[in-house]
Amino acid sequence: MVAVFTIDIAIFAISPLILRAFGTVPMGESYISILAFWLYGCASIAVGMFISALTESQVIAAVLSFAALFISYMMGGITNVISSSGNLLTKILSCFDLYAPFDNFSGGTLDITAIVYYLSVIAILNFLTVQSIQKRRWSISRKTFSTSVFSASFIAVALALTVVVNLVVGALPSKTTSIDCSYSKLYSITSDTKKAMKNLTDDV
């Protein structure tokens, strides 16, 4: 599924080059948006594959996948309703917000934390999908119990590693994780601005 989706995105990625022949095109913003859409799509596919591995019914898998992606899309509004200032619960729920990292790319900023987040979601969901499929291959026996324990511990380690990686990347300074690729460098401080700020004596 990802291969088919990637082929579609690759074809779509040609459009900025075609439009460039007819005028000025912000190439950085265009391709960052395409990258964000590809990562978001791959994460959504990973969600659907994981849910499909939990049930043998295609209808149930489709309904649950749609519900999960819809809730994820609405998670930003849900967290604002719970607490506008933010608390521990909203921080935990924000981990399930697939759309917020996508929105970070829309202004032409290459957000490394968002890329790591999407790759983590894709990797952990694919891992859980494989674990779910492998679990069905074992019949109820003593060997199954030992395998289940191994899988549970392996899953816990994978989840913990995913959380640690995202926390480490999130703790990095924004100047190293956010790259301004906008056409007019909207999010960068120019040399003229730096010179003007050096002459300021009062707080702005």
Which residue ranges define each predicted feature?
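Cytoplasmic juxtamembrane regions at transmembrane-helix boundaries
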Residues: 1, 60-64, 130-151
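Hydrophobic/aromatic residues in alpha-helical transmembrane segments
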Residues: 46-48, 128-129, 161
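Juxtamembrane extramembrane loops of integral membrane proteins
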Residues: 164-167, 171-204
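Terminal transmembrane helical anchor/hairpin motif
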Residues: 61-132
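Hydrophobic alpha-helical transmembrane segments
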Residues: 30-35, 62-63, 115-119, 152-156
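Hydrophobic alpha-helical membrane-embedded or membrane-associated segments
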Residues: 4, 8, 41, 118, ...
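Secretory targeting signals
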Residues: 2-59
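Internal/C-terminal transmembrane anchor helices
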Residues: 143-171
